[in-house]
Swiss-Prot record:
Induction (UniProt): Expressed in the intermediate phase of the viral replicative cycle.
Region named DNA-binding: 439-446
Region (Disordered): 1-71
Name of the protein: Packaging protein 1
Quaternary structure (record): Homodimer. Part of a genome packaging complex composed of packaging proteins 1, 2 and 3; this complex specifically binds to the packaging sequence on the left end of viral genomic DNA and performs packaging of the viral genome. Interacts with protein 33K.
Length: 446
């Protein structure tokens, strides 16, 4: 009977110690199979006898891994700090949405009166959802930090993405020419161009003062401060070239063929990176002569043929975001191929609103209205600030950026603002559900 009862036990259990404390215990049983066990009817450890059905042992060799709880029932100090950080962001966004003039048609969201009320009345489900949102915000901030400078500004506009096609929108007097030079001198376009082609309808349209400013600032952008009061060039050229061209010279058929020895762009690309800046050419762009190949086909051929040409940039200045005249389709192709849309807040609000409605379809309505309010604020209170939309950002936090002469290029973190607004909606839904069930309870009680 004892032998049958011991079939379900483990064979490596230690023998009971002897009564004498100085006496050693008997030998431990070893792991074995049926062939070398003194009792041939004993069962093996690995369950090699499937025909014999028995109940599983209550003591398993390896304990099962404990499953994590779906919700935590208590909040530690770190969790409270995370909730407080999210609560501060939430309060700031809620106040901004309430005070902005575009909030008339926006549905007001219910919220707790204080952070203490949120902790005491929120409930485990709500608090854990808010902690998940805060964790995703923290991960977004950590992910984008490696692309930023120590002061939080962006190190570049394109981060070596090629080709770099940008459209600049702004009325007369908003500082477009100064912006173009600042992009070169501030080294926001990498790699720094060794040759800059400045395209205007006529060559004599550029005053000597502006030519001197261009030559000075592109030279400034080619150097960085080095050790012991030295400067380090950022390209293979000590002095970058500034080349003036008319729009007619740009559209010369020879300049489209990269194999043509007279192609000015091919000769420049054989030495290093280049940039093409088109200013005051909006009327010519709207004509019949198509130059869309400069935005897509020509860059790939140039970059493949000349290894030294590690950068190809085209920056086109437009006075109107939606021009009526575009016979050659140049402006339409430019908007499609452009990776950057640099917009002055001085642009007419109707054009701005149309652009925002198109490029913020994936965002909540409140975030789109917030972006319109930001444009409106800078239109009324600043002069030379710009807002940038990046179609292919290196990080989602950089879809929308703010460019200031004082602060540099700063991400606007609209994706994080959307997450904060998601937390506001979650709190609103919880409070609304509780109020609905309270009304239902009182109606049944009567």
């Amino acid at each position: 009977m004892e032998e049958k009862a011991g079939l379900g036990r483990l064979q490596n259990q230690q023998d009971e110690p002897a009564q004498d404390p100085h006496q050693r215990a008997g030998p431990r049983a070893t792991f074995h199979s049926d062939r070398n066990h003194p009792n041939k009817e004993a069962e093996a450890m690995e369950g090699q006898n499937p025909a014999c059905s028995r109940h599983a042992s209550s003591h398993s060799i390896q304990p099962q891994a404990s499953k994590p709880k779906k919700h935590r029932n208590y909040l530690d100090g770190a969790a409270v700090d995370d909730l407080k950080s999210l609560w501060d962001r939430l309060q700031t966004l809620q106040q901004s949405l309430t005070n902005m003039p575009y909030a008339e048609g926006l549905k007001p969201l219910k919220n707790f009166a204080s952070f203490e009320e949120l902790l005491s009345m929120g409930g485990d489900s709500l608090l854990n959802d808010l902690l998940d949102i805060q964790d995703s915000i923290t991960q977004c901030c950590m992910k984008v930090s490696k692309y930023l400078n120590k002061d939080g500004s962006c190190a570049s506009l394109n981060y070596y993405k090629q080709p770099f096609i940008a459209a600049v929108y702004g009325p007369t007097g908003c500082g477009k020419s100064q912006l173009l030079r600042n992009l070169m001198s501030a080294q926001l376009i990498v790699p720094a161009p060794e040759t800059v082609f400045f395209i205007t309808p006529q060559v004599d349209m550029i005053p000597p003062q502006e030519i001197a400013a261009w030559e000075t600032q592109i030279c400034e952008g080619n150097f960085l401060a080095g050790p012991e009061n030295t400067v380090v060039p950022q390209s293979g050229s000590i002095m970058p070239k500034f080349v003036q061209m008319s729009y007619a010279e740009l559209t010369n058929e020879a300049n489209y063929d990269v194999t043509n020895p007279t192609n000015v762009f091919a000769r420049a690309a054989s030495k290093g990176p280049l940039a093409i800046v088109m200013d005051e050419c909006m009327e010519d762009l709207g004509g019949n002569r198509g130059i869309a190949k400069f935005f897509h086909a020509f860059p790939s051929k140039l970059l493949d043929r000349f290894p030294k040409c590690t950068g190809y940039s085209v920056i086109v200045v437009l006075h109107n975001m939606n021009p009526r005249r575009d016979q050659g389709g140049n402006i339409a192709n430019l908007k499609i191929q452009a990776k950057m849309h640099i917009i002055s807040p001085k642009v007419h609000p109707s054009q701005l609103n149309r652009f925002i409605n198109i490029y913020t379809k994936g965002q909540p309505t409140a975030i789109s209205l917030l972006l319109k309010d930001i444009f409106n604020y800078h239109r009324l209170n600043t002069n030379f600030d710009w807002i940038v939309y990046n179609t292919e950002p290196i990080d989602n936090c950089m879809h929308w950026l703010y460019l200031s002469p004082d602060e540099g290029l700063i991400p606007m973190y609209l994706n994080i603002q959307a997450k904060v607004y998601q937390a506001m909606e979650r709190i609103h839904r919880t409070i609304t559900d509780r109020q609905r069930w309270t009304r239902y309870y009182h109606s049944k009680k009567k």
